[in-house]
């Protein structure tokens, strides 16, 4: 069994989407960084890696019985060494997990670059372990509170957090079913649409607002988010945490 020693991790808890498990360059000074003395290292195939990185589902039973609760998984495109070399060029495919006593990867972390390189070197000539596990036949369903990676692609950690906050506020707005209010907010988003939305129903306006807001991130998105969360203590607190200033 391979082991990596003195491993620095920055745990992200309860994340079902890999894009929220931040890479080292997005770690912050106020994150809680932990040093693990010794961690078993395991290479798995791409399917299992993706399952672990992007789900909060049970790990294969054989894996749980064979290894202790902390593991590092290395993604490969397939079992041949060429694919590993390609991944080395991409610099992707390593994740640390901690089940904290459960059967699911509750906590996940990336590694620091130096230790990522060490992992790639350690597993270069190692065959991937095979484990049986149940994969859902249907594709994972993303929704407004669990956006697809495509929607989050290319955003910084702060932008991802604010975009998820915007979606939370839009989701709450959807529960009101208040046509006058959604017309107001769409006009805030797009003043030129004032006349158009006066002849639209609530669901149509909300769907159009969400459809437009889910693309990219800009000052326009940030302004809408700031205005939507104003006066809502929980949302305002999340806003302040990302901006280090109070919502005016």
Curated annotation (Swiss-Prot):
Listed InterPro entries: UPF0736
Organism: Bacillus cereus (strain ATCC 14579 / DSM 31 / CCUG 7414 / JCM 2152 / NBRC 15305 / NCIMB 9373 / NCTC 2599 / NRRL B-3711)
Top-level taxonomic group: Bacteria
Protein name (database record): UPF0736 protein BC_1176
Pfam families found in the cross-reference section: DUF3603
Family: Belongs to the UPF0736 family.
């Amino acid at each position: 069994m391979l082991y990596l020693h003195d491993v620095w991790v920055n745990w992200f808890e309860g994340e079902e989407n890999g894009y929220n498990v931040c890479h080292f360059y997005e770690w912050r000074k106020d994150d809680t960084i932990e040093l693990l003395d010794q961690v078993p290292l395991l290479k798995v195939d791409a399917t299992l890696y993706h399952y672990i990185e992007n789900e909060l589902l049970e790990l294969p039973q054989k894996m749980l019985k064979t290894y202790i609760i902390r593991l590092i998984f290395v993604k490969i495109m397939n079992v041949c060494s060429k694919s590993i070399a390609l991944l080395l060029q991409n610099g992707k495919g390593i994740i640390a997990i901690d089940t904290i006593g459960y059967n699911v990867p509750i906590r996940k972390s990336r590694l620091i670059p130096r230790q990522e390189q060490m992992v790639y070197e350690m597993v270069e000539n190692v065959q991937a372990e095979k484990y049986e596990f149940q994969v859902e036949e249907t594709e994972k369903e993303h929704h407004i509170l669990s956006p697809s990676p495509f929607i989050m692609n290319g955003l910084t950690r702060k932008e991802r957090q604010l975009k998820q906050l915007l979606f939370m506020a839009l989701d709450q707005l959807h529960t009101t079913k208040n046509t006058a209010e959604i017309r107001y907010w769409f006009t805030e988003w797009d003043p030129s649409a004032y006349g158009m939305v006066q002849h639209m129903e609530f669901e149509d306006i909300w769907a159009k607002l969400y459809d437009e807001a889910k693309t990219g991130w800009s000052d326009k998105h940030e302004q809408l988010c700031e205005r939507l969360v104003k006066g809502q203590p929980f949302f305002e607190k999340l806003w302040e945490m990302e901006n280090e200033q109070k919502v005016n």
